[in-house]
Amino acid sequence: MKKLTKTHSHRQQKLASIINEALIEILRRGKMLDSRLFDCPLTITKVIVTTDLKIANCYFLPFNTKLTIDEIMDALNNSKNAIRNFITNKINMKFSPDIRFHYDHGFDNAIKVAHLLKDL
């Protein structure tokens, strides 16, 4: 019998947790980051690591910012090398995963569903 949900290994979950903590720390410090991120509070909503541990998909949600999502994505991608170096120092692995940033549409989708249910 096949499982309906995809489970993540212990190593994936552990690495995702370490990356999440490191992202929070480097965003809080703000050193070596793109200057546009200084006045842009971000929440890291989740980190998903691929099964081969080579890619970490990091989902974020901005709060009270004048920047567009594209500007935030550009600033995060400009800071990707500094973030990856910081994470490399936190983990004890042969390879450091490639960090990929994604806007988390979960809250937008929840609002849309709430409006649809309200209209019923």
Swiss-Prot record:
Compartmental location: Cytoplasm
GO biological process: maturation of SSU-rRNA
Keyword flag Cytoplasm: yes
InterPro entries, per database record: KH_dom-like_a/b, RbfA, RbfA_dom_sf, Ribosome-bd_factorA_CS
Record key words, sorted: Cytoplasm, Ribosome biogenesis
Domain of life: Bacteria
Main localization of the protein described in the UniProt heading: cytoplasm
One Pfam assignment: RBFA
Any single Gene Ontology cellular-component annotation: cytosol
Molecular function (Gene Ontology), one example: ribosomal small subunit binding
Protein role: One of several proteins that assist in the late maturation steps of the functional core of the 30S ribosomal subunit. Associates with free 30S ribosomal subunits (but not with 30S subunits that are part of 70S ribosomes or polysomes). Required for efficient processing of 16S rRNA. May interact with the 5'-terminal helix region of 16S rRNA.
Family: Belongs to the RbfA family.
Subunit text: Monomer. Binds 30S ribosomal subunits, but not 50S ribosomal subunits or 70S ribosomes.
PANTHER family from the UniProt entry: RIBOSOME-BINDING FACTOR A, CHLOROPLASTIC-RELATED (PTHR33515:SF1)
Protein name as annotated: Ribosome-binding factor A
Naturally occurring in which organism (per UniProt): Rickettsia peacockii (strain Rustic)
Taxonomy of the source species: Bacteria, Pseudomonadati, Pseudomonadota, Alphaproteobacteria, Rickettsiales
Gene name of the record: rbfA
